[in-house]
C-alpha cells in the first residue's frame, strides 16, 4: 500500500475551514461521501471553537476568503503543529510568509490551487499542488487523495513560482479577454450588431476564441478584477503588461507591411515553440474542437442520465432503434437536484426530424431525461 493509499477515513479526522460554500463545501461533501469524519468551521467561529476543531483533527483544509487566512494562521499556527495543512486560495501573497514559517516549524503543508470553480464538472480539470518545506509529504499525499476523489488532473509546482505562473495563465488571458470585450462593444455599437449575431457570421478562429471570451464574460467582473489586480501588483505582471503594450505599438507601426508583420508574428511564435511540437498539437486539438462544435451546433440532443456503467450503451441502443445517426458526443458530470451523480450528454445527430415523444418514453424507462433538441440546419 502506498503512502497516498494510507490516507484513509478511519485514520484521518478532517476539519474544513469555510465548508459552507465554494471549494470548502465541495471538498467537505466529497470527503464525507468517501467516509471521512469531517467537521466544518466557518470564518466567524469563536477562537475556542477553532482551537477545539484543530485539536480534534489531523487534516486542516482551509477554504475561507484569502484575506482571512493570514489571521487564522497567525492566531492558531502553534495549535497546527503535528497536523497536515492544505489551503486552496487563489491569491497567496497575503499569507505565504506565514505558511513558510509554519512549514519551517515542522507543520506538514501543501498549498493547492484548483484551476476551476468549485461548481464546475471537475473531472480532468487542473489543480496545482505546492508542497512547502521538508515535512510536506503527508499533506501532499492528503491533497492527492482529495483532488483524486474529484477526478482532477494534478500538477506539481514550486510554491515560490505560483504568482508568476498565475500571471501567465490567469492575468494575461483575463486582461486580453476583457480588452477584447471592450473593443467588441465599441465595434458592435458602431455597426448596430448584437454579439450573438457574430456567432453565425464568424470564422473558425473567432468561434474558438469565443469560448474563452464567453466564459470570462459570463463571470462576475470582480473575478477578472481580482485576478488582474493581483497580477499587476507584481513586477512580473507589470512586465507582461508592458510587453503587451509594446507588441500592440509594434503591430500598429508595422501594419503597412504584410511581410514585416508576418516576420514579427513568426518570430514571436518561434520564441515560445522553437521545435513546433506545441503548434502541431494545437492544430490537431483545435481541429477536433471545431469538428465537435460544428456537429453539436448543427443538430444535437441534450440528455441527462444517472452516472452508471453501461448507461451510454443503453442510451445509444434506444437512439439506434429510432435510426438516429450520431455524429458527435460530449459528456459532463453533474450533480442532480437530489444530490446524486449524473451525467449530461450532448449528442450530435444528422437527422433533421425526430420521433421525440416515443424517444422520450423509451429513455424514461431507463431513468434518462431528454433535456431538449436543436435540429437547426
Name each region found by the language model.
Residues 16-17, 62, 129:
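Hydrophobic Val/Ile/Leu positions in short beta-strands of Rossmann-like dinucleotide-binding domains
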Residues 12-15, 127, 301:
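Conserved hydrophobic helix-helix packing surfaces used for dimerization/oligomerization
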Residues 2-52:
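NAD(P)+-binding Rossmann beta1-loop-alpha1 motif at the extreme N-terminus of oxidoreductases
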Residues 99-167:
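Rossmann-fold dinucleotide-binding core
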Residues 51-102:
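Rossmann-fold NAD(P) dinucleotide-binding segment
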Amino acid at each position: 500500500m502506498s503512502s497516498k493509499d494510507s490516507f484513509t477515513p478511519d485514520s484521518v479526522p478532517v476539519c474544513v475551514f469555510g465548508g459552507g460554500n465554494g471549494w470548502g463545501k465541495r471538498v467537505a461533501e466529497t470527503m464525507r461521501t468517501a467516509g471521512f469524519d469531517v467537521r466544518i468551521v466557518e470564518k466567524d467561529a469563536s477562537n475556542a471553537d477553532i482551537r477545539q476543531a484543530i485539536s480534534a483533527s489531523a487534516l486542516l483544509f482551509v477554504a475561507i476568503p484569502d484575506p482571512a487566512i493570514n489571521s487564522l494562521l497567525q492566531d492558531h499556527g502553534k495549535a497546527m503543529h503535528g497536523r497536515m495543512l492544505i489551503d486552496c486560495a487563489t491569491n497567496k501573497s497575503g499569507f505565504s510568509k506565514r505558511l513558510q514559517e509554519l512549514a519551517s516549524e515542522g507543520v506538514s503543508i501543501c498549498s493547492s490551487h484548483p484551476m476551476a470553480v468549485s461548481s464546475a464538472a471537475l473531472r480532468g480539470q487542473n489543480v496545482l499542488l505546492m508542497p512547502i518545506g521538508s515535512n510536506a509529504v503527508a499533506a501532499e499525499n492528503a491533497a492527492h487523495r482529495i483532488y483524486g476523489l474529484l477526478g482532477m488532473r494534478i500538477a506539481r509546482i514550486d510554491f515560490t513560482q505560483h504568482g508568476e505562473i498565475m500571471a501567465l495563465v490567469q492575468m494575461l488571458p483575463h486582461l486580453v479577454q476583457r480588452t477584447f470585450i471592450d473593443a467588441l462593444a465599441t465595434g458592435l455599437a458602431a455597426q448596430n450588431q448584437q454579439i450573438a449575431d457574430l456567432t453565425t457570421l464568424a470564422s473558425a478562429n473567432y468561434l474558438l476564441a469565443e469560448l474563452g471570451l464567453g466564459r470570462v464574460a459570463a463571470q462576475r467582473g470582480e473575478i477578472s478584477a481580482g485576478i488582474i489586480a493581483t497580477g499587476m501588483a507584481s513586477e512580473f505582471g507589470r512586465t507582461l503588461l508592458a510587453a503587451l503594450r509594446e507588441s500592440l505599438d509594434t503591430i500598429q507601426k508595422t501594419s503597412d507591411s504584410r511581410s514585416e508583420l508576418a516576420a514579427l508574428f513568426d518570430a514571436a511564435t518561434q520564441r515560445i515553440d522553437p521545435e513546433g511540437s506545441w503548434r502541431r498539437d494545437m492544430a490537431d486539438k483545435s481541429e477536433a474542437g471545431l469538428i465537435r462544435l460544428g456537429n453539436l451546433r448543427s443538430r444535437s440532443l441534450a440528455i441527462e442520465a444517472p452516472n452508471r456503467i453501461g448507461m451510454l450503451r443503453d442510451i445509444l441502443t434506444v437512439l439506434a432503434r429510432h435510426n438516429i445517426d450520431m455524429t458527435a458526443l460530449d459528456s459532463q458530470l453533474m450533480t442532480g437536484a437530489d444530490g446524486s451523480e449524473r451525467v449530461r450528454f450532448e449528442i450530435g445527430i444528422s437527422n433533421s426530424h425526430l420521433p421525440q415523444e416515443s424517444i422520450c418514453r423509451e429513455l424514461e424507462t431507463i431513468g434518462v431525461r431528454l433535456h431538449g433538441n436543436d435540429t437547426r440546419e
